A protein has these predicted regions:
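PRY/SPRY (B30.2) beta-sandwich protein-interaction domains
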Residues: 1-223
Length: 223
């Protein structure tokens, strides 16, 4: 009030995100991880974690959800993942048990220690995950191409179906691998890419790729 205002200094557009007390977005959980290092508001993750993961702060028991992550620095075992609350993130790699899945940069998708090969990624590529918590179906994408000829909007071509009560985004980095997640906060991934400004069907989020029809950002307004 009284025309007393702060003047922004040394701020870029990507330093301002829609996350707020009235609509809180998922980030990576700083206390639910095994040896990972976080930056950029707990959206960037690195660290040489051979057996272990980091989960997100917001999960879902029902509904359809979408998130994405940019592979800033390539390492083949670095993975975008999903896990439930029962997974032991301190001793398991993503997809080692039936309690998590992981899509690795080198092209392998893991579930219950079984691997299926899809497209590999390189630095600058973008991982995508869409999941339906009601049916347990999971889709994975690379640069807006859904693997296994998947079509999340139509419910076809999922890479895995699981029976979980609770779904949480997760991450695993190995060696020099670096991932920058976007749960709808910043489609430029901290200025590493050109922002694309795609919202979900409720008008929430700032995604690089448009979420599939019927899939939404993990935020408190959508829950």
């Amino acid at each position: 009030g009284n025309d007393n205002h702060f003047t922004p200094s040394n701020l870029n557009a990507y330093d301002v995100v829609p996350d707020s007390p009235t609509n809180n977005y998922c980030v990576l959980n700083s206390v639910d991880k095994d040896g990972h290092t976080n930056a950029e508001g707990n959206l960037e993750v690195s660290g040489n974690v051979i057996y272990g993961m980091q989960r997100g702060t917001i999960g879902a028991t029902s509904g359809k959800w979408y998130f994405e992550a940019r592979l800033n620095t390539y390492q083949g075992d670095t993975a975008i993942a999903l896990a439930n609350e029962d997974e032991n993130i301190f001793t398991r790699f993503s997809g080692e048990t039936t309690n998590s899945v992981g899509y690795l940069a080198d092209n392998r998708f893991f579930y219950n220690s079984g691997a299926t090969n899809y497209s590999s990624l390189s630095a600058g590529n973008i991982f995508q995950i869409a999941f339906d918590a009601d049916t347990g179906k999971i889709w994975i994408g690379k640069n807006n191409t859904w693997q296994n000829s998947g079509d999340p909007a139509n419910g076809t071509g999922s890479v895995q179906t699981v029976s979980w009560n609770f779904f949480l985004p997760a991450a695993r980095t190995v060696g020099s691998g670096v991932l920058h997640y976007n749960f709808g906060q910043d489609s430029s991934f901290g200025g590493h890419s050109t922002a694309q400004n795609n919202a979900d069907g409720n008008g929430y989020g700032d995604f690089y790729y448009a979420p599939p029809t019927g899939f939404f950002a993990l935020n408190t307004k959508n829950l």
